[in-house]
Amino acid sequence: MAKKIDGYIKLQVPAGKANPSPPIGPALGQRGVNIMAFCKEFNAATQKVEPGLPIPVVITVYNDKSFTFIMKTPPASILLKKAAGIQKGSSVPNKTKVGKLTRAQLEEIATTKEPDLTGADLDARVRTIAGSARSMGLEVEL
């Protein structure tokens, strides 16, 4: 018989830097999950990812206090800021532009985010990422 799911925990954890301090410790502790086991497994799974890059993770907690987790791709906004070389997006995106991205950069981000995007083909995914870039005040060359 399959294990009964007790709940889900959604977190954004820096790659390779999971530790028992907040927000990870309290979120897992409330459900009775072994915090150090999660930290070790997560850090091992994110060894090949750039250290410090925030990785969204969905932790499934079972009623016997065991867990599994699914890692998603980094948020598009983080990847866009990194590609444009900026610290933060524009506060008035329709007036003030803070950077510029080429189609090649957008394609690279779209292929990175491919598992999490719903676009049918690469062009549709690029348009999705371009929309996110425009809403951050980045100029897009398509």
Curated annotation (Swiss-Prot):
Show the GO cellular component annotation of the record.
cytosolic large ribosomal subunit
Q: Could you confirm whether the keyword Lipoprotein appears in this record? A: no
Q: Which GO terms describe its molecular function?
A: large ribosomal subunit rRNA binding; structural constituent of ribosome
Write the record's keywords in alphabetical order, separated by commas: Methylation, Ribonucleoprotein, Ribosomal protein, RNA-binding, rRNA-binding
Q: PROSITE patterns in the record, alphabetically?
A: RIBOSOMAL_L11
Could you state one GO biological process linked to this protein? translation
Keyword Ribonucleoprotein: yes or no? yes
Domain of life the protein comes from? Bacteria
Concerning Pfam families, the annotation shows: Ribosomal_L11, Ribosomal_L11_N
Briefly state the modifications made to the protein after translation. One or more lysine residues are methylated.
What protein family is recorded? Belongs to the universal ribosomal protein uL11 family.
Q: Which HAMAP family match?
A: Ribosomal_uL11
Q: Assembly and partners? A: Part of the ribosomal stalk of the 50S ribosomal subunit. Interacts with L10 and the large rRNA to form the base of the stalk. L10 forms an elongated spine to which L12 dimers bind in a sequential fashion forming a multimeric L10(L12)X complex.
**In UniProt terms, what function does this protein have?**
Forms part of the ribosomal stalk which helps the ribosome interact with GTP-bound translation factors.
Q: What is this protein called?
A: Large ribosomal subunit protein uL11
Q: What is the lineage of its organism?
A: Bacteria, Pseudomonadati, Pseudomonadota, Gammaproteobacteria, Moraxellales
